[in-house]
A protein has these predicted regions:
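Short beta-strand scaffold segments in enzyme catalytic cores
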Residues: 1-5, 9-14, 33-34
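Short helix-capping/linker segments at secondary-structure and domain boundaries
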Residues: 2, 39-44, 115-119, 177-187
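A short acidic Gly-Thr/Ser loop motif
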Residues: 4-8, 26-28, 128-136
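Conserved ATP-utilizing enzyme core subdomain
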Residues: 21-109, 113, 185
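Phosphate/pyrophosphate-binding loops at sites that engage ATP/ADP/AMP, CoA/4′-phosphopantetheine
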Residues: 94, 113-124
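Glycine-rich phosphate-binding/hydrolytic loop that grips phosphoryl groups
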Residues: 106, 158-190
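Glycine-rich phosphate-binding loops at beta-strand->alpha-helix junctions
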Residues: 123-145
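Generic structural signal for residues in well-ordered beta-strands
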Residues: 150-155
Length: 190
């Protein structure tokens, strides 16, 4: 199972009896990166250090997770702006940046976890790809929830012969080659 954490988080896997499953799970790095640009004069939270230094507002995160998107089954898709309105929430804006970032990281992790919980079976391995794999706070939340099933970092990529940083670029090249060859580029459940 692959969780790709870019601006939008998405997951793809192959389930016995179901076939290929792929869908957007919710925010990836978008909300955290946008918050950093707006309020911290930085492009992103390097290694998730600011988020890790704060205290997440679990109650706020749970109210955000009540949004219909998180309970809707797959396939489903969204754009990086879909949850941008969360950055205007006064409950977030009144927090110090570390606590705001901690809350955004928990929201992102819990939205990913909610999507995994919708699967027919819990994946034995969850490979983390994309820039979000460098956010140690985000990874910590996922590891706390799914334990050793969560695999992040270059070791996984090297072992599987793909680059976790280049997953989307490699996928686009693969899909382009299939399109040129007149082959399908999608599956019914994606």
């Amino acid at each position: 199972w692959v969780a790709n954490l870019t601006g939008v988080a998405n997951q793809t896997g192959i389930e016995s009896g179901t076939g290929v499953i792929g869908f957007d799970t919710g925010p990836g790095n978008a909300l955290m990166d946008d918050y950093m640009r707006l309020y911290c004069d930085a492009d992103f939270d390097k290694d998730g250090a600011l988020a890790a230094s704060g205290i997440a507002d679990a109650t706020l995160v749970e109210t955000w997770l009540d949004e219909r998107y998180f309970t809707t089954g797959w396939p489903k898709s969204l754009d990086r702006q879909a949850f941008r309105h969360r950055l205007d929430d006064t409950r977030l804006l009144t927090k110090v940046p570390a606590d705001a970032m901690a809350s955004l990281a928990l929201f992102t992790a819990n939205s990913i976890a909610a999507a995994i919980d919708q699967l027919p079976a819990s994946p034995k391995t969850i490979l983390i790809a994309g820039g979000g794999r460098r956010n140690l706070c985000l990874l910590s939340h996922l590891q706390n929830r799914f334990g050793s099933a969560v695999q992040g970092g270059n070791i996984v990529g090297d072992r599987l012969l793909f680059s976790p940083d280049m997953l989307e670029a490699e996928l686009m090249a693969f899909l382009a080659a299939r399109h040129i060859a007149g082959l399908p580029t999608s599956f019914p459940a994606t």
